[in-house]
Amino acid sequence: MATILQNLPIGQKVGIAFSGGLDTSAALHWMKLKGAIPYAYTANLGQPDEPDYEDIPRKAMQYGAEQARLIDCRSQLAAEGLAALQAGAFHITTAGVTYFNTTPLGRAVTGTMLVAAMKEDDVNIWGDGSTYKGNDIERFYRYGLLTNPSLKIYKPWLDQLFIDELGGRAEMSEFMTQAGFGYKMSAEKAYSTDSNMLGATHEAKDLEHLSSGMKIVNPIMGVAFWKDEVEVKREEVTVRFEEGRPVALNGVEYPDLVELILEANRIGGRHGLGMSDQIENRIIEAKSRGIYEAPGLALLFIAYERLVTGIHNEDTIEQYRDSGRRLGRLLYQGRWFDSQAIMLRETAQRWVASAITGEVTIELRRGNDYSILNTESANLTYQPERLSMEKVEGAFTPLDRIGQLTMRNLDIVDTRAKLGIYAKSGVLSLGTGGDLLNLTGKAAE
């Protein structure tokens, strides 16, 4: 039997990741009418734009679900978000502004926890709303099969019969209205939005055009800081970490990581912190564009990285960042629980994050404009007295530096010899002054 089912499995249990929106509502009711036995599963990821989670399973039952469950995924999402932060698992940046992989983190949690819940109900066929051109179809495929090796995939949006009968939002809205549900299609936005407690993604439609900028987006986790009429006051915030875990904001301790992240979102959101505009490579290698929000993670990451640079040495920081970029890409590809990803993140958690204890005070202004005002940690290896020109005990002397510089003569001689070889081969031309070294020939092209 194929893993991916192209036709509706009549008479069988089919689990659907149910959001309560038009697409999944129409799909669920359609599957019921066609003879399947739909089970609805909704993930509570702390979405900032979801007003009433409890109402979603009730809707699913009205539309024909045999059973509807609400799965609280917030604690697991917070834990995975912290692991990503500790490992610096963020590979998409533009001019130093970071995308915090919040959608891939949400998919890792949703794809495992919902399928685990389905397995409890003896539901071994899963459907969701991901499209065939996107990243999510592969992420959910991987996480689903990792959780339940017997899982089969049925997506209404890959079923030609469903597409023929309910191919667009207008058709879905009419279908639900005729069924007696009085479903009103919401006003069409200029872009689509997907969110969870860690961040929001805005993409597609008008945002596919690079001439449409961030200003067409209505933020859901913070303020539109680019608008002059939006008042944004300067604010100082102190973030405290203990052994790599954020534990306090402005002196208030948060034993519950979920509550700390929500408060960090509120603080960062008041300034529009963490918004970014990124061009990225999807899993299929086609480029896409997204506008992202992550006010809380951005705030925590500023403080975390400040402590990383003050506590660890250069080689450790280099390895942390190189490994973080590799791990970020694995996370993006839906491989967060693969062995190579676990190896990278647990190494960072054990040898980098465990030493991160201290407090960082930050002044937030508009958007990603901020200043670090103070850094305190008992673990700091930053010690200004080591570089003091005053006489201090334990400092190195001029004679020590003379010896160190003399040892550099060996590699300087080697470098000079290499440059001579390159000049003889025509790769370099030796001139004078500012033109001392110039690439020539093919190397300059």
Swiss-Prot record:
It comes from the Bacteria. The keyword Glycoprotein does not apply. One of its GO terms (biological process) is urea cycle. The keyword Cytoplasm applies. It is an enzyme of class 6 (ligase). It is found in: Cytoplasm. NCBIfam families: argG, PRK05370.1. This is Argininosuccinate synthase. It comes from Polaromonas naphthalenivorans (strain CJ2). The gene is argG.
